[in-house]
Every structure is written in structure tokens, then in C-alpha cells.
């Protein structure tokens, strides 16, 4: 993948795909992702059903400037200055159903996890998970990029409560799916040896049957990214095959976050730890960058670029033809990171598209 290093910001499923791609690089080709910053995520939304829902409320998608999740509300900021909001509990009609088999709220396999739950207004909760993540956060604090203090007991209890709610709800859902013959492979505990054995038998046709056709695809774009012959394409709805796979290629099946996950990545009993495995948890703010919940992700990305820790970072901007649609891209420019700070929690479903476009 060359010598370039990238910092990825993504949802739990995207971070999991990045982890699998690099762990099994002899099968997937690897990636330049060197730092993984995961976002807290309860669920994502289907643009198709969101469009239908908004139309029922008298709003067209082209009238929307941006979407945000704020204080338990789903908020649409319109181009004309008006604001439409509903409680998160009422977003069920346009929630992506594949999100209901995920039990990871805090991006458990990232280096650093970031979200708003558990910290005061204009601050972010930061979970430090790896030694690499600790070195980054310690340096950000020491050099003044961020200010941090240990999360309060009340804040951590709230965070654990929300994470447990996702685990409890979605465990019930995926077990029901398994009971009626709709496989949820990512929740089946298997060893590393079993993982290699199973995935080495599978190609895109198997991915189609085991993940896509049963409604488990999260549109992360990992399969498209790792395909060595560009046989997989993703439109706005699902991955499709446009030509035959190479005979001995199993890259897409190894990379997908909704196929098997070995206990080397997700240790047994991880769901019993609502916040996953971690080293430290902080409440953090970054006064130098104006962004949602303190601009903390942006401050970390600026630190990584200014100190040559990575060459590029992933940020979310606006699709020029559809401002409401978040678009992920890679940049080495500090000004791009600062400009994107206000879109911190706008997550884009096709998370690997920026890397694919760079190939």
C-alpha cells in the first residue's frame, strides 16, 4: 500500500472493517489506515426511507442543508433557515435495519473512540483504547491541542447505560433473526483458525447470500475497496458484482464487517463490557477549533497532520450536488479539517469510498 499513512474516522462497522483489512492483509491487500478514530453510534439511516419520511412532512431532500443528532433529537437544518426536529425514538421508519444486529456503541476496536454522551455540553467523551491511542491523546494534551479531565462517575454511568441499551436491544433482534434462518455471522464466536477456514471458502457470491441478500450489509465499501480486479461496485443501495471473481480471491469476505469475526478481534465476552476494553476515559474540549461538541476529532486530526504522524486524514464534507448528503474524502490540508469541523457527527455510509477513489 506504499508508505503513506492515513487516519480514519468512522462508525463502529467501518472501524471493524479497517481492522479486518489490515489484520488479514495477505488476503485483502491491506490499507494505509494507521490510526483508527471511532465514533459513538446507535444506528444510521436509510436515505431512501428518510427521503420518503421527509416528503410526508412536506420537506424535499434538496431543501436540506445538513442533518445532525443533537440532545436526543434528529435535526434537519433547511436551506431557508427553518429547522425540523423529532426525537430519536421516532426515527424508526427510516433507520437502517442492518444496524439492528450491531451491539457496538463505542467503536470497541478503534485506537480512540469519541462521542458526546457522558460529557458536558461543548465537550466530547474520549475513550483511549490502545497504546497508540494513548500516545496521541497524551501528546494532544501536552501540546495544548485539547484539554482533558477524567470523565465524571455520573457521565460514565450514563455512557454505560446507553451502550447497554444498544447491546440488550440488538442482541434480542439478532437472536430472533438467527432463529428464523437469517444468519448473523458476525455474532458467531469462532477462533482465528476457524475464521481462516470459513472465509477461505468464500467469494462475492457467498457475500451476496450471507450478508447482502439478508439485509446485513452496512454499505461501508470495504468489499469494493479490497477487490483486486474492481469486480465489485457500490451504488446507493448495495454492492454488486460486475465480473467474475478471481479463482483464489477471498478478499471481500475477509474484509466485510458482517461476515465472521474471530476471537482475536472480538474476544469472548466483549458484549459484557458495555464500553469494550480501554485504558482511560476523558471529557475533552478543544477551544481552538469551533466544532460540534468541542471540535475534538478535528483537533486530533490537526495534531496528527502537523506532527507528521499521518500523511492524510479522512474528513466529511458536503456533496456539491446534494448538500444534505455527507461525503467522505482524504486530505492532507489543515484548512480542510477545520472547515469540516462542524460536520463532525455527520457519518457517511460508504466509508471506504475515499480510499477507493485514491487507488
Feature map (PLM): residue ranges:
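Immediate flanking context of iron-sulfur cluster ligation sites
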Residues: 3-6, 85-97, 209-215, 239-247
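Flanking helices and flexible, charged tails adjoining ferredoxin-like Fe-S electron-transfer domains
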Residues: 1, 146-147, 152-189, 195-197, ...
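Iron-sulfur cluster-binding cysteine motifs and their immediate structural context
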Residues: 107, 112, 199-216, 222-240, ...
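Gly/Ser/Thr-rich loops at beta-strand to alpha-helix junctions
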Residues: 8-18, 43, 293-296, 320, ...
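Cofactor-cradling patches in redox/metallo enzymes
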Residues: 1, 16-23, 355-359
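A short alpha->loop->secondary-structure connector
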Residues: 23-38
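Short, conserved secondary-structure transition motifs
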Residues: 39-52
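Long, compositionally biased charged/polar accessory segments in the mid-to-C-terminal portions
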Residues: 54-201, 310-311
Amino acid at each position: 500500500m506504499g508508505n503513506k499513512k492515513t487516519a480514519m474516522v468512522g462508525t463502529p462497522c467501518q472501524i471493524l472493517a479497517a481492522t479486518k483489512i489490515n489484520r488479514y492483509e495477505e488476503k485483502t491487500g491491506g490499507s494505509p489506515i494507521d490510526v483508527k478514530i471511532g465514533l459513538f453510534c446507535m444506528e444510521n439511516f436509510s436515505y431512501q426511507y428518510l427521503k420518503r419520511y421527509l416528503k410526508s412532512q412536506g420537506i424535499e431532500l434538496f431543501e436540506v442543508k445538513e442533518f445532525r443528532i443533537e440532545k436526543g433529537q434528529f435535526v434537519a437544518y433547511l436551506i431557508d433557515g427553518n429547522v425540523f426536529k423529532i426525537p430519536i425514538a421516532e426515527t424508526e421508519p427510516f433507520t437502517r435495519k442492518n444496524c439492528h444486529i450491531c451491539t457496538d456503541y463505542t467503536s470497541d476496536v478503534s485506537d480512540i473512540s469519541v462521542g458526546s454522551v457522558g460529557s458536558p455540553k461543548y465537550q466530547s467523551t474520549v475513550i483511549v483504547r490502545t497504546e497508540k491511542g494513548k500516545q496521541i491523546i497524551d501528546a494532544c494534551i501536552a501540546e495544548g491541542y485539547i484539554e482533558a479531565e477524567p470523565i465524571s462517575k455520573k457521565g460514565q454511568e450514563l455512557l454505560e447505560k446507553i451502550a447497554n441499551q444498544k447491546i440488550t436491544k440488538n442482541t434480542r433482534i439478532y437472536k430472533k433473526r438467527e432463529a428464523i434462518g437469517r444468519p448473523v455471522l458476525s455474532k458467531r464466536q469462532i477462533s482465528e483458525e476457524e475464521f481462516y477456514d470459513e472465509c477461505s471458502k468464500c467469494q462475492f457470491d457467498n457475500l451476496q447470500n450471507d450478508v447482502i441478500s439478508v439485509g446485513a450489509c452496512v454499505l461501508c465499501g470495504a468489499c469494493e475497496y479490497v477487490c483486486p480486479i474492481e469486480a465489485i461496485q457500490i451504488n446507493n443501495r448495495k454492492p454488486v458484482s460486475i465480473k467474475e471473481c478471481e479463482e483464489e480471491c477471498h478478499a471481500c469476505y475477509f474484509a466485510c464487517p458482517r461476515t465472521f469475526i474471530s476471537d482475536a478481534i472480538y474476544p469472548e465476552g466483549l458484549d459484557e463490557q458495555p464500553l469494550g476494553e480501554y485504558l482511560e476515559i476523558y471529557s475533552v474540549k478543544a477551544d481552538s477549533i469551533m466544532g460540534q461538541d468541542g471540535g475534538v476529532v478535528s483537533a486530533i486530526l490537526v495534531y496528527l497532520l502537523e506532527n507528521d504522524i499521518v500523511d492524510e486524514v479522512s474528513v466529511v464534507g458536503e456533496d456539491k450536488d446534494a448538500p444534505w448528503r455527507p461525503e467522505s474524502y482524504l486530505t492532507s490540508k489543515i484548512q480542510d479539517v477545520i472547515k469540516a469541523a462542524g460536520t463532525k457527527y455527520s457519518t457517511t455510509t460508504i466509508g471506504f469510498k475515499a480510499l477507493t477513489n485514491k487507488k
